[in-house]
Amino acid sequence: MEQFFALFTIFLSFAFPGRCSDVFSRSDFPEGFLFGAGTSAYQWEGAAAEDGRKPSVWDTLCYSRNIGNGDVTCDGYHKYKEDVKLMVDTNLDAFRFSISWSRLIPNGRGSVNQKGLQFYKNLISELITHGIEPHVTLYHYDHPQYLEDEYGGWVNNMMIKDFTAYVDVCFREFGNYVKFWTTINEANVFTIGGYNDGDTPPGRCSLPGKNCLLGNSSTETYIVGHNLLLAHASASRLYKQKYKDKQGGSIGFGLYLMGLTPSTSSKDDAIATQRAKDFYFGWFLGPLIFGDYPDTMKRTIGSRLPVFSEEESEQVKGSSDFIGINHYFAASVTNIKFKPSISGNPDFYSDMGAYVTYLGNFSVIEYPVAPWTMEAVLEYIKQSYDNPPVYILENGTPMTQHKDTHRVEYMNAYIGGVLKSIRNGSDTRGYFVWSFMDLFELIGRYDYGYGLYSVNFSDPHRKRSPRLSAHWYSDFLKGKTSFLDSKGIKELQSNFSSSS
């Protein structure tokens, strides 16, 4: 593979001998800025029933709805050493992955599964040995089914205690080598998808036409969001009181944030856009930065929105050392005058009072190249939420092609957008491509991949192969490849095709 990278670099030097005014390289980023790529436990590990692991709510949803599963997926559980070698070849600074709660503590509380513990120790050791920073997510859609059956999982505040005990094990066992912890992955979309819409784990809702056996879309969405914040605050407090002085790490919270723009120039749509930002951004950033929910949400949702006690408010406020952002595309916002609800009862969308429409032609799968949407998100966070440290924890586009030129163009543009935001004052400290390799996706399953590396899921050995984007990213991270303009990318596509 190194030989290919060398040839690829020589090719680029002939294809793009000049530099344009907006071309820049890795060296333009601040010292210590992390470039990486990501996966998550259920999407990458496989080995779903091996070595003591028990089902999570993600396993259960997949089997109950017959929508494919992550039983084997990439088989990262057995192939992690091979994958770390690929990370070295790609020149990653960091690798973002999650820990499976149901592998480490299969029943959600109580005894630790020693084989699961050893797997994560081995993975982290392999990363550290090869100079790759572990960036660990503690919860990624997959709490143990045992806790869901026992008391309803996140709809019950008993989850806060069990989550805190689980992360205590993680901090104790891995914290000497892990400096970056994200407690919850994309908390807003996890909550909306899992408890309002019922489309993602654990699949609870009360909307008609949905395949939900349990749930209440009017209340559970907000109860779960509240419990996630309290669980994060509890984990953060534990880390800072017990581990931070010795381990020196930081603890953050993850959100899925779109670039939101009014669909028209009307005042109503402008107001609706700000309301949508309060519901998507402020729902969690408000408590984390200021200690409470936005007034917009409190007025609209009323008694269905839980209330922080004074003590809870103080615990949540300032509990996040950084904000993790998952960002893929933009959306337009249209005001809803009469707040219709499918069920006749209020839910997240009717409460928000806005239609949010994704921008782009999604019939072609890949996402549009629109880096200004990420710039707008980072600027809004800077202006509205005291400019906290930020890591872009997911950014990428799905594609089916091996010669994924559009992904190269997308990554090039969005990384450039991050640099522009930094130059404009955003405290953004890292960028992670989603994903390092093709995975079992939350929505697309195995229909298309986001990976820098393709995975042959029909091959029992799950062969990995570098896409064009892997070579491009590797050369950029080595400082050999400067950013390409659109003309150069088209030439790259043509020349790469002719040389394949």
UniProtKB/Swiss-Prot annotation:
Q: Is Glycoprotein given among the entry's keywords?
A: yes
Query: Per the UniProt annotation, where are the glycans attached?
Result: 216, 361, 424, 456, 495
Its keywords, alphabetically, are: Disulfide bond, Glycoprotein, Glycosidase, Hydrolase, Signal
Signal peptide segment: 1-20
Coiled-coil region(s) at which residues? none
Q: Which Pfam families does this UniProt record tie to the protein?
A: Glyco_hydro_1
Q: Which SUPFAM superfamilies match?
A: (Trans)glycosidases
Q: Which GO terms describe its biological process?
A: carbohydrate metabolic process
Q: What is its EC number?
A: 3.2.1.21
Residues that hold a beta-D-glucoside according to the record: 43, 140, 185-186, 328, 394, 434, 450
Give all cystine bridges in this chain: 205-212
- What are the positions of the active site? 186 (proton donor), 394 (nucleophile)
Q: Which GO terms describe its molecular function?
A: beta-glucosidase activity
What is the main EC category here?
hydrolase
PROSITE patterns with a match to the protein in the record: GLYCOSYL_HYDROL_F1_2
State the reactions this protein catalyses.
Answer: Hydrolysis of terminal, non-reducing beta-D-glucosyl residues with release of beta-D-glucose
User: What protein family does this chain belong to?
Assistant: Belongs to the glycosyl hydrolase 1 family.
Tell me the PANTHER family matching this sequence. BETA-GLUCOSIDASE 1-RELATED, GLYCOSYL HYDROLASE
Q: What is this protein called?
A: Putative beta-glucosidase 5
Q: Which organism encodes this protein?
A: Arabidopsis thaliana (Mouse-ear cress)
